[in-house]
């Protein structure tokens, strides 16, 4: 199979828990929804969850908004620090909607599992996956690729499951990132090579692939990175990271292709390093 090759320019420095899908509206469902609505914070309209504190008149406000307030937003009285144990007991029997329900998540779950689910929810806004950039963009999964195409136009995209990722000028000093996109199997993958000083005086390269998609979708693929040349070969195979996870943790834990500058020189030619990238379906 022929490989495509392109130059990567330096950029500078859910799987959700098993869901309880919302069924057709029944008396039980309506009753639960009515109860859940009683826990809505009057400031942010998220839910007030245990531990629940009330003002002297019995009004509730969520723990995120409470530190920002000087008085009760409902009655303007003192906030106080009265804990409402009876309401907390009711909260234990209510199934609360995910905070991303307006974006399409249909899961309802106990308050004890709500925060954990929302951290992994596939409807949570995605951040810009471009490393080394100070881009603060967030949006839906469908909007990620249009954002990259319009705001990060220097990133090259190659078609096919078997390509060459060419990082130029790898001897540049300091922390440097190289980024390229690969499109195959109807999905887009971001290839990232980072050079950073993880330990004092010891620079290393970290290469990884992430899917522009959910964690569940990422599990359907595997990627292989290979340095090849001068009768030497260095290979790494793994499951792509979802852009929901990001790559910072993987790099911190060395859960990617890792090699130091001396190894890079064994495979580089004229300061450029080619990495063979193969994406396959599991």
Curated annotation (Swiss-Prot):
Pathway: Protein modification; protein ubiquitination
Any one annotated GO CC term: nucleus
Induction cue: Induced by p53/TP53, suggesting that it may be required to modulate p53/TP53 response.
Localization of this protein: Cytoplasm; Nucleus
Residue span of region Disordered: 1-23
Family, similarity comment: Belongs to the SINA (Seven in absentia) family.
Protein's UniProt name: E3 ubiquitin-protein ligase SIAH1B
Lineage, opening ranks: Eukaryota, Metazoa, Chordata, Craniata, Vertebrata
């Amino acid at each position: 199979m022929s490989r495509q090759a392109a130059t990567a320019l330096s950029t500078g420095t859910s799987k959700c828990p098993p869901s309880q899908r919302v069924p057709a509206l029944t008396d039980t469902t309506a009753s639960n929804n009515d109860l859940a609505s009683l826990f809505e914070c009057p400031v942010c309209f998220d839910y007030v969850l245990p531990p629940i504190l009330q003002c002297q008149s019995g009004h509730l406000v969520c723990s995120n908004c409470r530190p920002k307030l000087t008085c009760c937003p409902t009655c303007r009285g003192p906030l106080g620090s009265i804990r409402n144990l009876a309401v907390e007991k009711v909260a234990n029997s209510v199934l609360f909607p995910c905070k991303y329900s307006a974006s399409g998540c249909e899961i309802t779950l106990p308050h004890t599992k709500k925060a954990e689910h929302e951290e992994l929810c596939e409807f949570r806004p995605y951040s810009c996956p471009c490393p080394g950039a100070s881009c603060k963009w967030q949006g839906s999964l469908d909007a990620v690729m249009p954002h990259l195409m319009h705001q990060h136009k220097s990133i090259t995209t190659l078609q096919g499951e078997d390509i060459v990722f060419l990082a130029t000028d790898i001897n540049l000093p300091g922390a440097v990132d190289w980024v390229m996109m690969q499109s195959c199997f109807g999905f887009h993958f971001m290839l990232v090579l980072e050079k950073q000083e993880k330990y004092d005086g010891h620079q290393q390269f970290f290469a990884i692939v992430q899917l522009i998609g959910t964690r569940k979708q990422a599990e359907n693929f595997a990627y292989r990175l290979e340095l090849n040349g001068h009768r030497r070969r260095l290979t790494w195979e793994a499951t792509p990271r979802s852009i929901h996870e990001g790559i910072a943790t993987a790099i911190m834990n060395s859960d990617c292709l890792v090699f130091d500058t001396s190894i890079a020189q064994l495979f580089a030619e004229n300061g450029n390093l080619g990495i063979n990238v193969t994406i396959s379906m599991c």
